[in-house]
Amino acid sequence: MSSAPTTQQNLAALPAPAMSDTGITSHIASRYHSHLPISTLSTQGYIAVNTYTNSAKGPNGGKDGSAMGAAEELASRMWARLGHRQENQAAIFLGESGTGKTTIRSHLLSSLLQYSSTPLSKKLSFAAFVFDSLTTTKSVTAPTASKAGLFFELQYDTGSSLHPTLIGGKVLDHRLERSRVATVPPGERNFHVLYYLLAGTSDDEKEHLGLNTGITAGTGNRSSLGTQKRWRYLGHPSQLKVGINDAEGFQHFKTALRNLEFPREEIAHMCEILAAILHIGQLEFMTSQSTTPAPDESGGYGHEGGEEITVVKNKDVLSMIAAFLGVGDRTLEQSLGYRTKMLRRERVTIMLDPKGARENADELARTLYSLLVALVMEKINQKTCAVEEAVANTISVVDFPGFADTSSTGSVLDQLLNNAATECLYNFCLQSFFERKAELLETEEVQVPLTSYFDNSDAVKGLLKPGNGLLSILDDQMRRGKTDLQLADSLRKRFEGKNPAIEVTSGTVQLPGANFATQNTSQIFTVKHFAGEVKYPVDGLLEENGEVISGDLMNLVNSSSSPFVAELFGQEALNKVVHPDDRNAVQQASVASKPSRMPSMARRRGGKAGRFGSRRGGDIDEEKDSDEGRARSVSRHRHNPKSADTQQGASAQFLSSLDNINKSLTAPNTNPYFFFCLKPNDRRIANQFDSKCVRQQIQTLGIAELSQRLKNADFSIFMPFGEFLGSAEGEVSVVGSEREKAEMILDEKSWPKNEARVGSTGVFLSERCWRQIVRAGDLGVVPMPPSDENPFNNPESLTPMDGKRGFGESKVHLLQTPGSAIYSDDKAAGYFGSRDMDAKSDAGASALREGDMFRNLETREELAEKGNEVTTTPIEERPKSASRVRWLVLVYVLTWWCPDWAIRIIGRMPRQDIRMAWREKVAINFIIWLSCAFVVFFMVGFPRIICPTQHVFSPSELTSYDGKNSDAYVAIRGNVFDLGAFIPQHYPSIVPASALEKYAGTDATNLFPVQVSAMCQGTDPDGTIDAAVQLNYQNRNYTGQNLISTTDNNAQYHDFRWATNDSRPAWFTEQMIFLRGHYWKGSVGYSPQYLKTLAKKSNQVAYINNRVYDFTDYIAGGRAPQYPPGEERPDTLPDSNFMDSRVVDLFSQRSGEDVTKYWDALNIDTGLRDRMQICLDNLFYVGQLDTRDSPKCQFAKYILLAVSIMLVSVICFKFLAALQFGKKNIPENLDKFIICTVPAYTEDEDSLRRALDSAARTRYDDKRKLLFVICDGMIIGQGNDRPTPRIVLDILGVPETVDPEPLSFESLGEGQKQHNMGKVYSGLYEVQGHIVPFIVVVKVGKPSEVSRPGNRGKRDSQMILMRFLNRVHYNLAMTPLELELHHQIRNVIGVNPTFYEFLLQIDADTVVAPDSCTRFVSAMINDTKIIAVCGETALTNAKASFITMMQVYEYYISHNLTKAFESLFGSVTCLPGCFTMYRIRAAETGKPLFVSREIVNDYSETRVDTLHMKNLLHLGEDRFLTTLLMKYHSKYKTKYIMRAHAWTIAPDSWAVFMSQRRRWINSTVHNLIEVIPLQQLCGFCCFSMRFVVFLDLLSTIVQPVIVGYIVYLIVQVATNPASTATTAFILIAAIYGLQAIIFIVRRKWEMVGWMIIYILATPIFSFCLPLIAFWNMDDFSWGNTRMVTGEKGKQILVSDEGKFNPDDIPRKKWEEYQAELWDAQTRDDAQSEMSGISYGTKSWHPAASEYGYAMSQHNMSTLSVPHMPHNGSRMSLLTSDNGMGMQQRDYSASDIDMSDMPNDDAILAEIREILATADLMTVTKKSIKAELERRFGVPMDSRRQYIGSATEAILSGQL
């Protein structure tokens, strides 16, 4: 190819054959290979090919021919036109991602700012760098890709001087790619600033920010600092090292902010927010059970706090995030665990699973980052933007992310909006080249050849047309709450066959093998963009367009203690939706997708450009948004009926911002330039040109058509003849017209016709020709010197700069490999020069770089502590009660050893009330443990103290140890040895064992003769006894066969006395020492009675210190001396009286007695006494005193048996009680009115349907039962797709169109939470032939509630009905919700609320038997003293897990034994809330019982601030309610009905089971404290069975000992089968035998297996659970109310919920309300009765009276109601069949003109005629009244009473 085409830069100058896609590609390729990447489209556009090398280096090594050179050239042209023509200039960058747009844009901005070298220009340069740091990232196609649209505006004053003066600038960011924050595509990076932070902070800063913890995402493990951290939000760890100097980038980022006048503290807070975002990515979630009781907990009712919740696994990371956000750890965790959103005008809280919580956390991270970017940009604009009126002209740089055919982050919305913006800018490009001057050319009569081109107007109109474009439809459907499929249908209707650029898939699809088409749930729409077709899935697009920030997160940051976070969420970029009734209640919000400011020229109406004089920019359009004070809240539109109910979505905002850009670019007097950026290949390889890739881009951008157009008409300037001739100056001829003169000049210039043409009024020129005619080459290319008059100049802070060197020469390459200026989005190259910082900024920046930016700021620990603090408001002040003071004294006595500071610091309990609760818990545990210790002592230690263990053997006992069936024992001189163990050790071993075994069970003393002189010292002081003295032995305790004779053959082998030939005096002593040490088992036992018997038989036996001595043989003379064989006996025998006579007399005179005191009283010296004691022990000792049969030992022996008998007797009574209920009561046909209340929380649809159906199907008159459902808050439970109230209403058949107004009522809560709001629905529920009226109360909360709106707990749900009935019976003023309840029950359902006599309470997961209601009511009618009755509750999930299996038998026995036993005496102490019926009022007197003042007041206690009250009201509200019934209605009974059955769900996991039992056990303990003071508890001598019940309850605290007691019995039985413990053990075993009889008699055979499982689980029930429960007694969610110490010992109750003012809730009596209701109905028949329904149908319509259900089959007015005692109401009732009437209204003649009023007979006749032809299914008294008014032609309001009474009478047959 020749060199001429290669050197041709202007593509419009190419020959016609080369002006095709292929030809232009070849030409660009030739230039590319010649290192000439820049081509032009005349002077209107540039084509730049990315070289992936240095963008500032041209073919000759200089800037000429490079991208930087092209940018500088364009800047020069823009500056020249701005200066000469005062035109607005705009540069628009077009191209795909990775083509180098951001780099060239940086060069262009740098070049433009060089012309105004002022501090302001430096700030704008820094602003551009900050913008890029926050919004650019590394993508697959580019090292630095822009992910937000940029409209950079430079503002100039061109009227005050010869040169334009830079007076301001704006950085308008459009649609940051928020999805990238939490979703980093593979191989890409997140926004650069996050990597800057991680790499550029110092060690101290990292420590503060928590960036050196080494937490690994996904594992939670810690690693060393040297290992590579895995940050979830930073992508793969390899992205941390991709050749970008992040550390240096962070320093420049901080420097830029400091030069933009951001304070150091603010920069530090920004870094904390960025660190918090990184840490949010590290959060790990898991599913747990809510086992910590809370005041607002409804807790799954049947699961008793087992609600599944999502919690954070790594709490340390959570703490860091909370500290940086200035919120509490627990508050943040809760906010992430659920999400509140708006569904059909309702706030609904969704309980999130771990996946949902992760998405919620990601949304928080995206929100924080988006708001941070918006805040930084707005603060920059505040510092750089000029006053709009002063702006004459602007230079705008527009750069949006390139076209994308796929979404890298998965965000369809981001892809759609970015492509829409690209489509819009490309369309503007086409309009600029092809259409913009067409009309002017035609007007000027200039003919130019037409050029065909691809017009993308169809796509632009289809996407961007206001009102019915795709983006507008998307926003409209979002705001109207439509579904994705409805969106697809709307798009199909709008575009199908109407716009070829947009196609929508079919709404139906026929699946393979299917015969019919089904709905297509995966619909997509295809947009034919100029760059190609893109398919956009519809699924999730509406929700993504909303970009809703839930009210929970808004509520979270509202409590933040961080001023910076408050500022972050208080800026205008956050669009808030506030409640129309409470402007402070933010329901939800979203981050704006449009900048907070507008382009300056978009706000102008237009104006004539002028060189000098007045402002030429045109007037500011006041209708448009201003830059100051733009309201972002939807509340200002809420009361406008034409405005939408919700805020604009992202699409509408982005559409508005595109419209503003388009207005700015298309404004008159604006000259656009275009930079078309191309990439040479798809693989980012330098010096490689892919012709196919480039040709596709050229074809997409239409460069060939653009070149052809410029070849035909390259006109960018139109100059009127006068201006043109004035510019030509000396070249103008002096003769001829202006047109002729202009033509002559053009002829002289010889310009081509496509660049210069003469029109009728002026001349069309190209920019090249214009520059020649005005000689613009010398103007504008040199930077302007600063003007002294420019207020933005600061001479002191300027750094000298010459015009030839500037920002583009920087050697700092932040976003590229150091040392190589690659062709990328190099912000550093554009923004930082080596000499562009003023001295002041340098000083501040260097100080920031060198030190710790967090120095002198709050530490992370201080931030965390501050975040956990809350602002409190005193709400109540009460003195301590005397009992409370006494209790606290005892608490401190027991816990004095633990100082308060230790609890606060070590226990981490900052609040005083929590520390006090901990002390109380420890004190209670001490008391419980002491009680257990006392029981242990009583059972084990006390008997041993009374009767110490004796190791003695009576004759019979010793005889039994004969070795035959037991061990072999033998007795020797009163000692019993283990012969069986000794036999193997006997010497010599040749003696057969059988020979020794014959001595088992005998006294073998005679086998062992003793040497008296060796064992006794006698009476002589020298201690010598003659060796010949002997002593016979005869044990008197045994019969002959048990006593071995002295003549036994084996005796000779043990005789080593002096008289034998083998004398061994010490042998016996040695043997006894050996035997006692190894084989001793005890002693021979002599009972006192037997000793007396021996004494009577002339035996001299007595005992000293319980040791028995026998002197019988000694006294009888058995002391004959013996001499060795062969030795002669001496004449004088030795003295054989070796014992003192006084000692001998003691035994002879007091034989059989205890001679201890006499022994002690003997008048003998100590030496003699000691010698006598030795003789007694060695020679006369025969055994121990056996006291085992003494009274005290008998008591100790049978005390265990007595305890066992007592336990067994109680259970035996229970057994008998259970048998008492064996008879079957036959239910009667009953006519009492009952209410069945079902509180619902987060149960699933199946559970709710089962509960409601079972209640509706009960065999009880449908007209006399009312289904009353209370939904506790607008919450979507895990696994549910709708909020619980909606599930309930769908089950009951209430359509979504029914939406009553929320009404105020009192709730149980803290501070302001006592004010709640609810909606009331009523109607009929039809199921399986039953038609049951129902009331549904939905607690929706006040407008200010954003998280869990309306939720207050189960007790509050109970109180709604209890308080309502209380006020009905006492005729008290009611809240609006209660008045509406009264109206619905009385006027719509048709029953006076006072008629209801019984209230059946079941849980939402409980199924009741069909005959349960009948049996309950029957029992209460038979015994009017019954105030409450419960039935048997079994399990529906018995086999779900081993945990549930353990509970089956326990449930059965607890009802059929415990409750049956308690019921015998009318004292069932715990009526389960899941299945109990209460008596509302007394049958005889009508006195309120269940809803009496005392019970309602005590049960509605809101001050639950002590451990005791929390255990009562938050753990065991059912038991406490029963306690209150016993306390205030002691004469009434609480009973158990065995035949009434219900089935509930038991906890199936250990955590939930433990939580439930912890509640039950602790509530039992604390209710016991409440029961003790009751006067009626104990009868005479405690014979009342309530005392036995008390003992039964008391056993709760000693349950762990029971297990120990059973183990003790087992050990006793095992060690001593003959003991009484065996009997006790048998008795306890019989307990289960009795229980077995019960279920055998009732044929409950399966209970045998369940009983075995229960026995095996006894250690868990009785040992583990109580210990865990007692220690976790203070494990509560303590809420926000606490006590602080006031003056004089008073306790001031404070709360951060604010103070509740009861006057906020209006109250009025029913009579007043009814009067107002009648008046309101007169004015508007549909007022206050949205829920009316025709009885027996599903047709909803307003109903005004009891006849809202009028029909022939189910006429509520024909009910037979028993006589009701008057309750003191001032209501005037008109009698009717059902005992109900309406309030009388008196109208006097002075009030109403009755002259034309028909008489009663006429009215009655017309009523008869109307009823004869009317449909009784739908007719109402209002419709009858309206028909009468039509017939008579007069108002009938004054006859309303008569019309109603007459209608009733006719329908009931009375007339």
From Swiss-Prot:
Annotated stretches, region: Disordered: 585-650
Record's subcellular location: Apical cell membrane; Cell septum; Cell tip
Gene Ontology BP, a term: fungal-type cell wall organization
InterPro entries: Chitin_synth, Cyt_B5-like_heme/steroid-bd, Cyt_B5-like_heme/steroid_sf, DEK_C, Kinesin_motor_dom_sf, Myosin_head_motor_dom-like, MYSc_Myo17, Nucleotide-diphossugar_trans
Residues covered by region (Actin-binding): 658-682
Membrane disposition: Multi-pass membrane protein
Enzyme class: transferase
Source species of the chain: Zymoseptoria tritici (strain CBS 115943 / IPO323)
Predominant location: membrane
Gene: CHS5
Protein name (database record): Chitin synthase 5
Pfam hit, one: DEK_C
Keywords from the UniProt entry: Actin-binding, ATP-binding, Cell membrane, Glycoprotein, Glycosyltransferase, Membrane, Motor protein, Myosin, Nucleotide-binding, Transferase, Transmembrane, Transmembrane helix
GO molecular function, one term: cytoskeletal motor activity
Key word Transmembrane present: yes
